């Protein structure tokens, strides 16, 4: 996360931030579960029901649990340095808490959450992390990710974030 508040034009605010110029549309085909070519590499996977009622397949139980926990925080206010579920979270506070609840300890700072295995954009699965130099978000499936904006919200998957350097997509459970 960043210091200060979260102005509408800042890294967390405003509809469509970072999703223009070939953003959301090209991601729509990813994370469709068992019909993806690499699904065999993950076995059956673990189902997750998203807020819209659709079902996606996480690669394993830890990733599924992390996504389920993260989704419970939708609407929670952004708080710089925040690590308290239901009260206030920053970006890395959200992802660290969700994975800790799933039994996996990951680093606190966003830019240090590029752990596990690097994942190609075409191989994204629920629970994978999108990591920037000062922000992190978690892929939930169907072309969306959850992130601590103001408040915690679902956004289209993207690789740009207010000019921050993108460190890639990562699977902490790999």
Spell out what each predicted region is:
Residues 74-126:
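Catalytic cysteine-centered active-site loop
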Residues 108-112, 116-120, 134, 140-174:
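Aromatic- and glycine-rich peptidoglycan recognition patches
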């Amino acid at each position: 996360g960043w210091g200060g508040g979260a102005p509408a034009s800042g890294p967390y605010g405003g509809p469509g931030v970072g999703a223009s110029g070939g953003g959301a549309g090209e991601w729509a085909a990813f994370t469709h579960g068992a019909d993806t070519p690499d699904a065999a590499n993950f076995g059956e996977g673990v189902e997750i029901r998203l807020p819209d009622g659709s079902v996606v397949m996480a690669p394993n139980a830890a990733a599924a649990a992390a996504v389920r926990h993260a989704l419970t925080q939708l609407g929670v206010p952004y708080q710089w340095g925040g690590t308290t579920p239901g009260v206030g979270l920053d970006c890395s506070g959200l992802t660290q808490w969700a994975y800790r609840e799933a039994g996996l300890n990951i680093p606190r700072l966003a830019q240090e959450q590029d752990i596990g295995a690097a994942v190609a954009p075409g191989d994204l699965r629920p629970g994978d992390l999108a990591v920037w130099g000062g922000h992190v978000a978690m892929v939930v499936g169907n072309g969306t990710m959850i992130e601590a904006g103001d408040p915690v919200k679902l956004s289209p998957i993207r690789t740009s974030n207010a000019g921050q350097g993108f460190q890639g997509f990562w699977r902490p459970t790999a």
